[in-house]
């Protein structure tokens, strides 16, 4: 039995694979303006977010301190979103061409942690808490809209409108406006957690839903565009390549691995801003 559980890939190995793919993707993201970075970097990078999502599902399910787990993800996501907000509204620290990073995957994960906890409360028949947690995430955008409709003068007050914009961008983000991942990523995260424990069903449903969201729906919309050819689904609309991550997920052996958990948390913001800073310097040299 021990030999069987040791076969495949553990959590650390999956995260390492995802990390390498993420770096390739972000090299393309930040240095695409040079025209020297192959698109295949971005294509390979499509697998990184699903793998990190899968690992986060497992991490949340196994952690002994969910509150600390959540706060760590929330804090990193909030800090990165606050800097993004500053870049958007103060137009500070932007690259010479106006570009600034829109990397907010930790905010997606933060919202998902709340929903996952809600799912567990429902399983424990704590219906009020479970429904409340899930409803808080789902209904928050509508609460904001209702608030702005009831108090339209807020949008005409510079300070008040800025505060509201900051709140819904950084500490209390809305699932409908996060700049990274998108609704299909969030839906995939809910499915992975809700179906956890039935690996084949879990990954089959996830792969089918993501294929529908990232291939079938974009293909249907792209077909309406003049000049579109189906091969563009492999050259331009390749977000659906992330479905291939299911093959690596199937190899997960249920083991956490050797650790390095702090590395994976802090590497994300560190490499984003290092690559962004390098791209700003290179842009200034080349312009």
Task: Label each PLM-derived region with a short phrase.
Residues 1-287:
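Alpha-helical transmembrane segments and their immediate juxtamembrane cytosolic regions
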